[in-house]
């Protein structure tokens, strides 16, 4: 969801091929990270993997992937702003490993990005992923999420669907 939100605008349709290719790329990247502990788990590393390794892997397939099915150049160009030197390179490339899982009280202040059409959906997904991680991993501990500006998150179709998707595991936990 995060990669698709970074890449596509709210109006863009996401094809099964695009979703499948990103899923395959992510699996391959995680396998590579498991084998090579020197890879820093951040967006820069994933971007370089897509640019160098995955693009080469796509070129060597017996069944070609056409640009109209999955345009890796468009993906890389669009996501360049989150890569080293881009205007949002700070967002997904933290040098610190912050443990939100074991913090008893976490506040995300989103006032500065709530009107930013590019950043707000990304920040919302990161917050929701942090919360769902707590829900799944911290068994037997009472959890609460208060969303003060929920109306803002629900104002776009993609975010409304994502919040709906995230509610199912919360009800179970």
Question: Positions of the model-derived regions?
Answer:
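P-loop NTPase catalytic phosphate-binding loop
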Residues: 1-34, 102-133, 137
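Helical/strand "switch-coupling" subdomains that flank nucleotide/phosphate-binding cores, especially
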Residues: 1-89
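Flexible, glycine/threonine-enriched loop-and-boundary segments that flank and lead into catalytic domains
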Residues: 68-110, 114-130, 161-162
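Conserved P-loop NTPase motor cores
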Residues: 111-173
């Amino acid at each position: 969801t995060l990669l698709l939100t970074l890449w596509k605008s709210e109006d863009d349709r996401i094809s099964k091929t695009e979703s499948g290719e990103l899923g395959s790329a992510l699996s391959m990247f995680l396998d590579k990270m498991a084998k090579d502990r020197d890879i820093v788990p951040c967006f820069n590393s994933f971007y370089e993997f897509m640019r160098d390794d995955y693009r080469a892997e796509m070129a060597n397939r017996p069944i070609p992937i056409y640009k109209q099915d999955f345009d890796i150049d468009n993906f890389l160009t669009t996501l360049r702003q989150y890569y080293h030197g881009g205007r949002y390179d700070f967002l997904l490339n933290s040098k610190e490993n912050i443990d939100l899982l074991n913090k008893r009280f976490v506040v995300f202040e989103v006032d500065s990005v709530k009107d930013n059409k590019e950043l707000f959906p990304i920040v919302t997904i990161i917050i929701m992923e942090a919360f769902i991680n707590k829900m799944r991993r911290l068994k037997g501990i009472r959890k609460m999420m208060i969303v003060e500006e929920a109306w803002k998150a629900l104002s776009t179709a993609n975010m409304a669907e994502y919040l709906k998707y995230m509610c199912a595991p919360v009800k179970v936990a």
